[in-house]
């Protein structure tokens, strides 16, 4: 059995954690539909015992997802140490997924569901303070996550699609590059590892015929690409990424999020994200996906 076959035969454990209200339950439901054995809110101290069960070769535990959150606050503090210990001592492949969202979006979701945040301590603490405290408590586990997903702008359907994209394919290459266009006026892409600002390029918005279109339209794309500044920028950008991306993979990252922003996220960033996605697909044998976060907002299209 070669090394690739050995890797495929190993059991896989995905620890799903993150901010309350960011979508952990939805992710667990999605993974369960995809055939994962799912456990909700396992105390971190029991994680090594659970991994021991997985190592016994039970077929039903070959792919496992465990949701862990701050409901057991004291127990949660040991999570990073436990994950590190299990990774160093077990043959089980362990990934950590961290879900987050903006404070404003989390507040909105809690108001919609009328549920109490687990750290509100029966009304002794305000919702915004509970969210801020949780964000602080989770900063360490976030720092070791293989996947960080910002669900602020994602609908439940879009979040499920992203999870399926990552985990549904048995032959899935473990390194994924997500290229996202966005508009600065709608907020920065919070889960981005690299952010590039292209607002210095000539803006198609000021060409009347191009204003209602997006960077997905040929006329807008050609307008953005015809400038010398664009060519110089793209050449320097790809040189940088050619150097950096292999290093990210070598360091054990499973995902790299590259965000390209312009003013509204409709023209320049969309065109360049498309071009970059095509380039990365040609140069690397990784999974490359392109997403346009705000193009539909500015163009007036329905999502």
UniProtKB/Swiss-Prot annotation:
GTP binds at residues 69-72. GO terms for molecular function: ATP binding; GTP binding. InterPro entries: P-loop_NTPase, RapZ-like, RapZ-like_N, RapZ_C. Keywords: ATP-binding, GTP-binding, Nucleotide-binding. Pfam families: PapZ_C, RapZ-like_N. Signal peptide: none annotated. ATP binds at residues 18-25. NCBIfam families: PRK05416.1. Belongs to the RapZ-like family. Displays ATPase and GTPase activities. This is Nucleotide-binding protein SAR0820. It comes from Staphylococcus aureus (strain MRSA252).
């Amino acid at each position: 059995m070669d090394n690739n076959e050995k890797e495929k035969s190993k059991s896989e454990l995905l620890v799903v954690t993150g901010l309350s209200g960011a979508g952990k339950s939805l992710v667990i439901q999605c993974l369960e539909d995809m055939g994962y054995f799912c456990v909700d809110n396992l105390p971190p101290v029991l994680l090594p015992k659970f991994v021991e069960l997985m190592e016994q070769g039970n077929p039903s535990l070959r792919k496992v997802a465990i949701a862990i959150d701050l409901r057991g606050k004291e127990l949660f503090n040991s999570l990073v140490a436990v994950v590190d210990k299990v990774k160093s001592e077990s043959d089980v492949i362990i990934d950590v997924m961290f879900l987050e969202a903006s404070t404003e979006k989390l507040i909105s979701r809690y108001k919609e569901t009328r549920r109490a945040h687990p750290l509100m301590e029966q009304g002794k603490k305000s919702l915004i303070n509970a969210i801020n405290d949780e964000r602080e408590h989770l900063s360490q586990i976030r720092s070791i996550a293989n996947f960080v997903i910002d669900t602020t702008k994602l609908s439940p359907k879009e979040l499920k699609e992203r999870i399926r994209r990552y985990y549904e394919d048995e032959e899935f290459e473990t390194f994924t590059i997500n290229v996202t266009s966005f508009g600065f006026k709608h907020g920065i892409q919070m889960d981005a590892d690299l952010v590039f600002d292209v607002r210095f390029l000539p803006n198609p918005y000021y060409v009347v015929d191009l204003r209602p279109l997006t960077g997905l339209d040929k006329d807008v794309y050609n307008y953005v690409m015809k400038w010398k500044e664009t060519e110089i920028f793209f050449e320097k950008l790809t040189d940088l990424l050619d150097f950096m991306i292999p290093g990210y993979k070598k360091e054990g990252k499973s995902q790299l999020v590259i965000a390209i922003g312009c003013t509204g996220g409709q023209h320049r960033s969309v065109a360049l994200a498309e071009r970059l996605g095509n380039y990365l697909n040609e140069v690397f044998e990784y999974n490359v996906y392109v997403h346009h976060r705000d193009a539909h907002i500015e163009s007036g299209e329905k999502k």
